[in-house]
């Protein structure tokens, strides 16, 4: 897991639950995950094990609540501490590597790498013009392309209906 993934989880938890009265309790996404887990368990037990009589109903409810509380504690403490450890280690790795990269040779600071120029990228992405009388671009794989002879471009109407212009 990386820092961006954990930060994304935290941001998602904050964005979904932004109601003022519940903001403090639902700010942690792990609490939200635990509540969702509890709801899923309640629905699962209600569907798979419907109580028949009062004794069984009470016993099932007690077992259900014990399971939910145990899972809540398990999820919250285990996952939260593990992810906090991972988050702290990732932060330290990032800090140490950035300091190491900046100061490799003592006080010497390595300049940042400049991005490639935009004009070169645009020229490569731009479609190439096909001159009149040249072969189609799709047929270039059959044999090597001959040097293109520059001919003046012919108007489209003349290509379609040459008889009108020849008269």
Curated annotation (Swiss-Prot):
The chain crosses the membrane at residues 28-48, 60-80. The keyword Nucleus does not apply. It is a multi-pass membrane protein. One of its GO terms (cellular component) is membrane. Glycans are attached at residue 88. Keywords: Glycoprotein, Host membrane, Membrane, Transmembrane, Transmembrane helix, Virion. It is found in: Host membrane; Virion. Its main location: host cell. Belongs to the asfivirus B169L family. This is Transmembrane protein B169L. It comes from African swine fever virus (isolate Tick/Malawi/Lil 20-1/1983).
């Amino acid at each position: 897991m990386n820092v961006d993934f954990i930060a994304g989880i935290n941001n998602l938890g904050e964005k979904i639950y932004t109601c003022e009265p519940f903001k403090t309790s639902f700010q942690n996404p792990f609490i939200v995950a635990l509540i969702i887990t509890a709801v899923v368990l309640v629905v699962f037990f209600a569907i798979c094990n419907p109580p028949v009589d009062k004794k069984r109903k009470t016993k099932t409810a007690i077992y259900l609540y014990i399971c939910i509380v145990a899972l809540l504690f398990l999820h919250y403490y285990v996952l939260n501490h593990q992810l906090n450890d991972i988050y702290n280690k990732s932060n330290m790795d990032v800090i140490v590597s950035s300091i190491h990269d900046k100061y490799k040779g003592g006080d010497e600071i390595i300049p940042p790498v400049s991005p490639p120029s935009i004009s070169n990228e645009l020229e490569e992405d731009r479609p190439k013009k096909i001159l009149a009388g040249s072969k189609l671009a799709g047929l270039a794989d059959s044999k090597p392309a001959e040097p293109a002879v520059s001919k003046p471009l012919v108007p489209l109407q003349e290509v379609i209906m040459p008889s009108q212009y020849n008269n």
